[in-house]
């Protein structure tokens, strides 16, 4: 795909101010190549079977007294004060409760090694406590838990508000601008083509060359990379045929041009309709988003803005997909395999954290149902997708999907399904990378007040070539916070509006 644009595509529109019919054909060639890439990625899925990770729980055993479960839900609205102290006896009680909660309620428990891995981690934490003394600060317990649970590469899993997964951010520079021809990647510097020979000493520069959109709507290349470093800038050395240049790549700031306080909006009067959704956690937002999906699907060219979308329940995602394309991409929700644990303990915990899930509707009725299942139900596992294959959908209408590093969880459920739709182009930066599980369980350890979030589900989907926790999905065109303005310029420049 990255070798499709020639010198004329990158620069003729700049000089002459309008896109020719030939350049429209060039965009179609790029679109065809994008379709081919997405179609090939359908087979790039986890090799594991979801059934290998279904927990084996005693049918009726709760695993806790009701007093213990109640103690885990008393301080859900605040994090622990890490400067306070606990006794070793209190810490041991907390550790015991935590690992039991993981055993009975954590969806990826088997995925991350089951009893063998978690028993080893628990023993290591208890060993640490024995050398901390009779009383110690809570931050020591947190440090021990983070160290020995670091194998939980699940971005939804947090210990006192912090994930164990390193997050990747996009660093880029739009100076200089690059194009590509048969000889390689080049920039026009001082009036001459100058070809890149290496970046940071590596002659394979493909990984650094990011397909993008210029401010006036042209398809171009910029140098960029993903990094887990926390600094706002990083430096690279670009070697040209006639010398070297030091470039400073800046961390892209995503939330520049959209308001996260407006959860949903739809502009049907624009040249190309724009539907923007930042989350579907509230019932009103969720309903509007779903109701408008069928209208969006009828548009010959449309923009779906999922930047900053922090998700919601999978029921909301399923409803939107059903409304948008019931017989097509809706079939691909839940990836290759998906299950959720419905243990008696997890039902109790979920019932007491319902305020976080208002998109599910009548919380009072759901609370009563969950408490009934806790009191009278049995431990079970709901298998919603088993060793399925993703299916490609040859859609004809053009859809641009905007995404950024704040598109996560339920927002990424939509990205996952939309990747199986033809003529769909993803624009922005990498998504946050939070798909493996969810956040259905909130607990606070009774003595230390250390707060945990984790999910009772497990999703197997694309493998690390397409998606990774903490790195997310990658866009087709890498654009910073002004992605909406640039895609509108792209549509105007290449004459893509109906």
Roles of regions detected by a PLM:
Residues 276-280, 305-309, 331-344, 402-406, ...:
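Active-site-proximal beta-strand/loop segments in catalytic clefts of secreted hydrolases
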Residues 20-319, 326, 430, 439-446, ...:
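Flexible, low-complexity junctional segments that flank or bridge functional domains
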Residues 1-4:
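Positively charged n-region of N-terminal signal peptides that target proteins for export
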Residues 296-382, 419:
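Glycine- and acidic-residue-enriched helix-capping/beta->alpha junction motif
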Residues 16-18:
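C-terminal motif of bacterial Sec signal peptides marking the signal peptidase cleavage site
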Residues 421, 426-489:
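BRCT (BRCA1 C-terminal) domain core and associated BRCT-interaction motifs
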Residues 398-420, 425-433:
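Extended C-terminal subregions enriched in glycine
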């Amino acid at each position: 795909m990255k070798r499709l644009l020639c010198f004329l595509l990158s620069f003729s529109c700049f000089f002459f101010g309008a896109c020719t019919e030939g350049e429209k054909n060039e965009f179609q060639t790029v679109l065809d190549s994008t379709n081919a890439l997405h179609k090939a990625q359908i087979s790039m899925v986890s090799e594991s079977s979801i059934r290998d990770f279904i927990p084996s729980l005693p049918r009726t055993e709760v695993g806790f007294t009701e007093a213990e479960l109640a103690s885990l839900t008393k301080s859900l609205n605040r994090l622990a004060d890490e400067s306070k102290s606990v006794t070793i006896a209190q810490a041991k009680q907390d550790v015991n409760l935590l690992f039991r909660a993981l055993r009975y309620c954590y969806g990826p428990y088997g995925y991350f090694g089951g009893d063998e891995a978690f028993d080893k981690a628990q023993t290591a934490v208890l060993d640490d406590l024995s050398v901390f003394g009779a009383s110690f600060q809570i931050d020591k317990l947190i440090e021990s838990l983070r160290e020995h649970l670091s194998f939980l590469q699940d971005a939804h899993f947090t210990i006192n508000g912090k994930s164990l997964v390193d997050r990747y951010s996009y660093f880029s520079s739009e100076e200089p601008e690059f194009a590509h021809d048969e000889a390689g990647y080049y920039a026009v510097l001082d009036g001459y083509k100058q070809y890149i020979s290496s970046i940071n000493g590596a002659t394979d520069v493909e990984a650094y060359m990011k397909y993008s959109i210029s401010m006036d709507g042209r398809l171009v290349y910029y140098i960029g990379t993903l990094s887990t470093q926390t600094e706002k800038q990083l430096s690279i050395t670009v070697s040209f045929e006639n010398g070297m240049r030091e470039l400073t790549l800046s961390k892209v700031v995503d939330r520049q041009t959209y308001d996260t306080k407006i959860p949903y909006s739809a502009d049907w009067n624009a040249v190309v309709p724009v539907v923007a959704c930042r989350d579907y956690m509230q019932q009103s937002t969720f309903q509007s988003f779903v109701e408008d999906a069928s209208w969006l699907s009828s548009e010959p060219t449309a923009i779906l803005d999922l930047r900053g979308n922090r998700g919601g329940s999978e029921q909301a995602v399923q409803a939107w997909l059903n409304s948008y394309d019931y017989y097509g991409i809706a079939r691909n929700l839940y990836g290759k395999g998906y299950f959720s644990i419905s243990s008696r303990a997890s039902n109790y915990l979920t019932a007491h954290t319902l305020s976080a899930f208002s998109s599910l509707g009548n919380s009072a009725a759901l609370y009563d149902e969950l408490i009934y299942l806790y009191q009278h139900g049995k431990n079970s596992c709901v298998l919603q997708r088993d060793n399925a294959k993703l299916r490609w959908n040859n859609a004809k209408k053009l859809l641009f999907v905007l995404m950024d590093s704040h598109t996560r969880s339920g927002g990424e459920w939509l990205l996952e399904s939309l990747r199986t739709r033809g003529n769909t182009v993803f624009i922005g930066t990498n998504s946050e990378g939070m798909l493996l599980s969810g956040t259905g369980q909130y607990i606070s350890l009774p003595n230390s007040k250390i707060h945990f979030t984790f999910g009772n589900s497990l999703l197997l989907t694309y493998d690390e070539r397409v998606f990774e926790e903490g790195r997310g999905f990658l866009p087709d065109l890498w654009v910073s916070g002004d992605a909406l303005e640039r895609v509108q310029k792209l549509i105007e420049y290449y004459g893509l509006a109906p």
